[in-house]
Amino acid sequence: MDFSPFDILCCPPPLFHCFGLVLGMLAVVTHGSKIIFPGETFDPKAVLHAISDEKCTALHGVPTMFEAILGVPKPEGFDCSNLRTGIIAGAPVPRPLMKRLFGELNMTEYTSSYGTAWNAMFHVFMLTVVRPHRSFTNLLQRRHYRLH
């Protein structure tokens, strides 16, 4: 994700799961970044407000969270121009969702992974998607990392 001390992570996944705790908290602790928890429970409207009000540069969530975030009306004055990266975990990311993340949330780079609940710090699958360096055809080429 190319985090730096200047990044601000919006982390709606719960801290009682590896995603929120390991991929959320440890990402900011190891890079000196800032973390925003938009609410006690997942609320897509609260996430949109956090992205805009806190000028978040990264967003974590599962595909269904991103679908919910994209499915609610944007608040007045919504600005996601700082948002660039994040992690989408728990399931593969459908191509239509990829396009919407690029077009509607300005997420020009993100990491897709799953297997964190079983492997914590070790990912069974990871794919970093960066645009505009690759076409959508090339986006679907996956890199597999195996633990031996």
What are these regions (language model features)?
Residues 13, 19, 32, 39, ...:
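Residues at the C-termini of beta-strands that transition into short coil/loop
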Residues 11, 46-47, 65, 97, ...:
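Hydrophobic alpha-helical segments typical of transmembrane helices
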Residues 8-11, 26, 109-112:
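Hydrophobic/aromatic side chains embedded in well-ordered alpha-helices
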Residues 7, 13, 84:
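Nucleotide donor/acceptor-binding cores
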Residues 33, 56-61, 70-147:
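Gly/Ser/Thr-rich phosphate-binding loop
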Residues 1-8, 16-58, 68, 72:
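Conserved AMP-binding/adenylation subdomain of ANL enzymes
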